[in-house]
């Protein structure tokens, strides 16, 4: 028998499936929201419904946005000669928190993985190659995780871009082997961007 009723137990179970939350944390959050349901819960429900309806991928870079083109791609003050390639949106957000990069981004939507059957055709690599030609890009910074999949993806992209003549660089010191960008602190990300190297 559910101690709090089926609807509340279902909400707790659903929240417990979110990344970084377990059953105990989910239960505490749900109790907190119920106690403040006229303020925080109603506001959160409205915001979540709005995001569910309007969130989409930027047509240019793949960032998550509420319109067709994200604010980064629309920003005329961004450097236009550089594209920083990341695995997913969480990595883009991590780099933005560090404020070390002032160019534009390209989100791949994953990494090459034979185990997970993710090939080049499953990623946004063709769009990257098209952007290089269309936007006059001079440097592609591969800010990919230092995992086997991340480095395999980096090498594949470097080889695919070789005929274009664009400079291809990658993050250097500061990123631990096997590390994920989303878990790094801002200083480490900044140092890694400044010490990038040619691949």
Curated annotation (Swiss-Prot):
Residues 81-176 form the Toprim domain. The lineage of its organism: Bacteria, Pseudomonadati, Pseudomonadota, Alphaproteobacteria, Rhodobacterales. Disulfide bonds: none annotated. This is Recombination protein RecR. A zinc finger (C4-type) spans 58-73. PROSITE patterns: TOPRIM (PS50880). The keyword Lyase does not apply. InterPro entries: DNA_Rcmb_RecR, Rcmb_RecR, Rcmb_RecR_Znf, TOPRIM_dom, TOPRIM_RecR.
